[in-house]
A protein has these predicted regions:
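Structural helix-adjacent loops and short alpha-helical linkers that scaffold large soluble proteins
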Residues: 2-13, 30-31, 164-181, 234-249, ...
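Aromatic sugar-binding interfaces of carbohydrate-active proteins
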Residues: 8-11, 15, 22, 304, ...
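Residues that flank catalytic or metal-binding motifs in active/ligand-binding sites
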Residues: 11, 149, 226-227
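Extracytoplasmic mature domains of secreted/periplasmic and thylakoid-lumen proteins
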Residues: 11-38
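A structural signal for well-ordered alpha-helices, especially hydrophobic packing surfaces
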Residues: 19-22, 164, 184-187
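An acidic- and aromatic-residue-enriched active-site/binding cleft used to recognize and process polar
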Residues: 27-28, 37-39, 169, 192, ...
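Extended glycan-interaction surfaces of carbohydrate-active proteins
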Residues: 33-145, 185-280, 313-341
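Extended amphipathic alpha-helical segments enriched in small hydrophobics
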Residues: 146-184, 279-316
């Protein structure tokens, strides 16, 4: 290590700008906890800035625009499905395309969920416009605060504090440490569900709850790898981490033939061959192992790693490493020679 501050000095303002972009463009309620969303784009909105969506019923479909129209359509419920480019963009922005937490579920799964007493509205996403001070549309936020995004923002603040300290900016370092602590407190107070013992995204309500949370955890959409992001980033309390690891090691949840898939077996949207709703992605698997190790579960993490290498088809042979793997059979899925993996 050269201890050369030049590179740190060059990168620091760029990383500060990136940090601030999220708070300016994806923090609709201004509480410091960003959401995922969509930029202003012809694929997402009309020229006048109204969000696009397509209503599908039977063999008919109609493209409409505007958040007010969207709210009316959702309230009436007279549709088979909705196609919303901004919803897709938000999931892509997270890196977890079509994940259950963003409201994605197959029709047959949703029908079963409703038949078992659930509500279709549990899987309906809502949006808000984000605008600059002069009223210019910047883009859209899902009206839910994502626990993985909050956890990464926690890490961002820690790293910025370290860089500010190196560069002799003590006040800025202090500010970023405070922001990190505020995020950790929020994650553990608002995003952990004591009943199911797991972390979830939070649905943003019209008014904050009495405890300062924007809303309640979205437990209905099931458990996913976002739930161990507070462990990977070090934002979790030890007690909450203990509970999450117990879920991760449960054969009825994530501890499958190939463990730590992108949806728990109990998730209503789970499918062993569904993109980001069951398949095992190596990056999310690794995040889980590192989070376990960080909170004192190294031996358990090593056992899961051993299971992965033994059961993921072709992984220890001469073939290419796959994009993802079937959690129940270990079958190769997705693209070969995938860079993340």
């Amino acid at each position: 290590v050269t201890q050369d501050k030049t590179w740190v000095a060059e990168m620091y303002p760029k990383l500060v700008a990136y940090h601030d972009w999220w708070l300016r463009n994806r923090d609709h309620n201004g509480n410091g906890v960003p959401e995922y969303g969509a930029t202003r784009d012809k694929a997402h909105n009309t020229e006048s800035g109204e969000m696009l969506f397509t209503v599908k019923k039977s063999d008919k479909e109609e493209t409409q625009s505007g958040l007010n129209n969207y709210a009316r359509v959702v309230e009436k419920g007279q549709y088979d499905s909705l196609e919303i480019p901004a919803q897709v963009a938000a999931s892509w922005e997270s890196g977890r395309d079509d994940a259950a937490v963003f409201g994605f579920i197959d029709k047959e799964q949703l029908d079963k969920y409703v038949a078992n007493g659930g509500k279709r509205s549990d899987w309906t996403v809502k949006f808000a416009e984000n605008r600059s001070q002069d009223g210019t549309l910047l883009g859209y936020s899902l009206l839910q605060e994502s626990v993985d995004q909050a956890s990464y923002m926690y890490s961002d603040n820690h790293y910025l504090a370290e860089m500010a300290t190196i560069l002799g900016k003590p006040e800025e370092a202090k500010r970023y440490r405070q922001l990190a602590q505020q995020l950790a407190d929020y994650i553990n107070t608002c995003m952990f569900d004591p009943t199911t013992q797991f972390y979830y995204d939070v649905r943003i309500e019209d008014k904050p709850l009495a405890n300062g949370c924007a809303g309640k955890p979205i437990v209905e959409r099931g458990k996913g790898p976002e739930g161990w992001s507070p462990l990977f980033n070090g934002a979790a309390t030890q007690a909450n981490a203990d509970a999450v690891v117990k879920v991760m090691l449960d054969p009825k949840e994530f501890n499958t033939f190939v463990p730590l898939g992108t949806a728990a077996l109990t998730n209503p949207a789970f499918g062993a061959d569904i993109y980001w709703r069951g398949r095992v992605w190596v990056d999310q698997f690794w995040f889980g192992l590192k989070g376990m190790e960080r909170y004192g579960y190294r031996d358990d993490a090593l056992k899961l790693a051993d299971t992965f290498f033994r059961h993921a088809k072709g992984l220890t042979a001469d073939g290419p490493i796959q994009e993802n793997y079937n959690p129940l059979t270990g079958a190769q899925q997705g693209a070969p020679n995938f860079s993340w993996s």
